[in-house]
Each structure stands twice: as structure tokens, then as C-alpha cells.
């Protein structure tokens, strides 16, 4: 089985609990010997442990076609990806995203953190999910927490594959009752579109 996972953090770059949780889950799934995992991360730094997982960087996935040669791709992205993967992803651009701000590689910039424009990054991440879902082969989609639910939904719409969302916490838990209606609606939409919902407790 092959799983396409969407997550916002991956060690050693940890900003909260999602990184260690995602790492542990992926490690456990891969250790069964029955599943390979492709993990889509907003902005890999190149020093992530990836001996047991295939990491794709959203920041390294083109959404606007650029005519760049192999050596330039190697120079820009060789620290975290094989240049051929850039071209494979570029071949699966599915719409005209030229209205978006992209860099010289045709890629959207991501902070790799939780910036003030987090909702914009979440939306852009879901655009990337459409390219990745058209490029990769997988049997199931796994989205870690609300930040990645829109990406998981988009990948499901593109591929028709089942979506499993992993609820690490809800905004009710994080906000102590002062729920952000935008976050709540993203969480609800994720749950409404999921084929499977996993959570960290039975409460």
C-alpha cells in the first residue's frame, strides 16, 4: 500500500507537537512493512530524516511552467529533491496559476512556519496537493490536523482515493472555547469530506 500524507511539520524543524506526532506515525506505519509513505511538507530544509519516507516540498513543487534546465534545478533544489521530480511535478500542473506570485522556478514560496498569512499558505498548500495528487501513485490520503485538511480534500477530489484525516486537536481544544469560525469551518469541512477520522483520544 502507498499513502500520500500531508503534514505541516517534520523533524528536526519542530514548532509544536505536529512534527514529532507525524514522524512517529509515519515511522510506525512504515515499520509494518506494508506501506510506503510520501509526505508533503510546506518547506523542507534538506536535513530532514528521509531514509524511510519520501518527502516532497510544497515550496519545490511548480504551479507555473518555467523553462529551466537540469543544472539550474539541481543548483536551486538539489539540497532536498532529485531534479527529475521537479520535471515530473511540472508536467502535472493542472490550471493557469500565473496570477499567483511564484518564484523563478514557478513555485509558491512557503514560510515553513505559522505566519500571519497562514490561511493563504493553507490555500496555496491545497493547490500544491492537486499537482502532487496528479503526479504520485497512492492508495490512501492521510491529512494531519486542520492545516492540511483542504489539501487532503483536494487530493481526494483529484484522485478519487479515500481520505483519512488525523485530528490531533480541534480549535475547541486549542482556544479554550474562543473558537475561530474560519478554523472551525475548515475542521468541519475536513470531517465532512473524510472517509475515516482518527483522533488522539476517545473523548
Language-model region placement:
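Histidine-centered beta-alpha loop that forms part of the nucleotide-sugar donor binding/catalytic region
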Residues: 8, 42, 167-170
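A short, glycine/small-residue-rich beta-strand->loop->alpha-helix junction that serves as a flexible
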Residues: 9-21
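Short amphipathic alpha-helix
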Residues: 19-30
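A conserved catalytic-core segment of Leloir-type glycosyltransferases
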Residues: 28, 32-133
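Nucleotide-sugar donor phosphate/pyrophosphate-binding loop at the beta->alpha transition
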Residues: 121-128, 162-164, 172-189
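Membrane-proximal helix-turn-helix segments that form the acceptor-binding/catalytic region
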Residues: 130-135, 157, 180-196
Amino acid at each position: 500500500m502507498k499513502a500520500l500524507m500531508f503534514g505541516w511539520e517534520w523533524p528536526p524543524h519542530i514548532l509544536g507537537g505536529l512534527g514529532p506526532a507525524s514522524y512517529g506515525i509515519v515511522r510506525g506505519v512504515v515499520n509494518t512493512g506494508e506501506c510506503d509513505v510520501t509526505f508533503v511538507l510546506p518547506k523542507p530544509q534538506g536535513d530532514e530524516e528521509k531514509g524511510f519516507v519520501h518527502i516532497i516540498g510544497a515550496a519545490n513543487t511548480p504551479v507555473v511552467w518555467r523553462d529551466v534546465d537540469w543544472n539550474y534545478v539541481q543548483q536551486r533544489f538539489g539540497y532536498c529533491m532529485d531534479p527529475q521530480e521537479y520535471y515530473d511535478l511540472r508536467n502535472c500542473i493542472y490550471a493557469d496559476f500565473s496570477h499567483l506570485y511564484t518564484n523563478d522556478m514557478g513555485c509558491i514560496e512557503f514560510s515553513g512556519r505559522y505566519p500571519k498569512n497562514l490561511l493563504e499558505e493553507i490555500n496555496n498548500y491545497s493547490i500544491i496537493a492537486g499537482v502532487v495528487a496528479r503526479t504520485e501513485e497512492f492508495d490512501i490520503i492521510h491529512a494531519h490536523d486542520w492545516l492540511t485538511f483542504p489539501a487532503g480534500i483536494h487530493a481526494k477530489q483529484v484522485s478519487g482515493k479515500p481520505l483519512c484525516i488525523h485530528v490531533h486537536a480541534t480549535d475547541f481544544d486549542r482556544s479554550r472555547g474562543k473558537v475561530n469560525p474560519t478554523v472551525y469551518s475548515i475542521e468541519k469541512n475536513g470531517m465532512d469530506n473524510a472517509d475515516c477520522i482518527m483522533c488522539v483520544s476517545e473523548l
